[in-house]
Amino acid sequence: MEISDIRNELEAMAKRLENYRASLNLTEKEARIAELENEMTYPDFWDNQEKAQKVIDESNGLKAMVDKYQDLANQHEDGEVTLELIKEEPDAEMQEELGESIQALKKEFDDFELEILLNGPYDANNAILELHPGAGGTESQDWASMLLRMYQRFADKQGWKVETVDYLPGEEAGVKSVTLRIVGHNAYGYLKAEKGIHRLVRISPFDSSGRRHTSFVSCDVMPEFDDDIEIEVRTEDLRIDTYRASGAGGQHINTTDSAVRITHVPTGVVVSCQTERSQIKNRESAMKMLKAKLYQRELDEQQRKLDEIRGEKTDIGWGSQIRSYVFHPYSMVKDHRTNYEVGNTSGVMDGDVMPFIDAYLRKTNM
């Protein structure tokens, strides 16, 4: 890397740091951290453990953002100092090392910039992710199980925890429907980019004639809400049914009616939970999911009204694919919203989804 190129990169990073400091309101964040840390010193801080954990989580999230900014600023300053040393006493080996470190630092800047884009009111929340196969029976149900694995692997790469809240296996293969609770900082902020129809084109392993098949799966993503989020759900509007849980592959099947299904009668929204052995806990989880779905429903309605005002028509049917995964006659995964595409289909199916999310978030926040 030439000296002039290194200088240009460092100047660009300096400007990015200025923009980050302004957009992050770092002074406010630092004041909030001090406020939370003071709250942690109260003698009765741990009396309400759930509230205490929320305070700790908020503090850790703010600290992570501030510390990462400071780390980038420090690395940038180190780069400036090293560049001056090289200009005073040219050293080819040191220059090469600096060029490599600048390239790595640029990647860190890009990753941090993506995290800054997650500034929605619930972006930091855990996520509820649902997969529902379209028409096509076993073929589309198998596609749903492939996407299930993809998102599980993606969550693992982010260090998030994945819980299967509801699972309905396919009769021959795959899944008829599955609901995941994904626990991690910014889980909803990232995964909201995956909401939509996912299309698969491949030679079906279930077709003895070896014909090419097209399958569809709907992915729905909602933020998980804390109990203190006020979303009005009247008891008289609910129908609550219990049934026996049936785990994936027939495992962990309860002999009592611990699984819970809640129907919100006015809207027809239905949620189910069977992950816990306790009916009470399943009901609590189902109510959280119901609130999330009702919130998402309201957001979708607001978006629909905005689209009408703008004269835009949004197709919410199976024709509105957000992404195509083509395994035959060639290999390609393409996002139709951003036109970002890759040829490494196996890598994507193994959880390399972040580049698609990155492209989508950058486009929608421009």
UniProtKB/Swiss-Prot annotation:
Residue numbers of N5-methylglutamine PTMs: 251
Post-translational modification comment from the UniProt entry: Methylated by PrmC. Methylation increases the termination efficiency of RF2.
Molecular-function annotations in GO: translation release factor activity, codon specific
Alphabetical list of InterPro entries matching this protein: PCRF, Pep_chain_release_fac_I, Pep_chain_release_fac_I_sf, PrfB
Subcellular location: Cytoplasm
Segments forming a coiled coil: none
Pfam families in alphabetical order: PCRF, RF-1
SMART domains in the record: PCRF
Alphabetic keyword roster: Cytoplasm, Methylation, Protein biosynthesis
SUPFAM superfamilies: Release factor
One GO cellular component term: cytoplasm
Function statement: Peptide chain release factor 2 directs the termination of translation in response to the peptide chain termination codons UGA and UAA.
The family this protein is said to belong to: Belongs to the prokaryotic/mitochondrial release factor family.
Name under which the protein is recorded: Peptide chain release factor 2
Gene: prfB
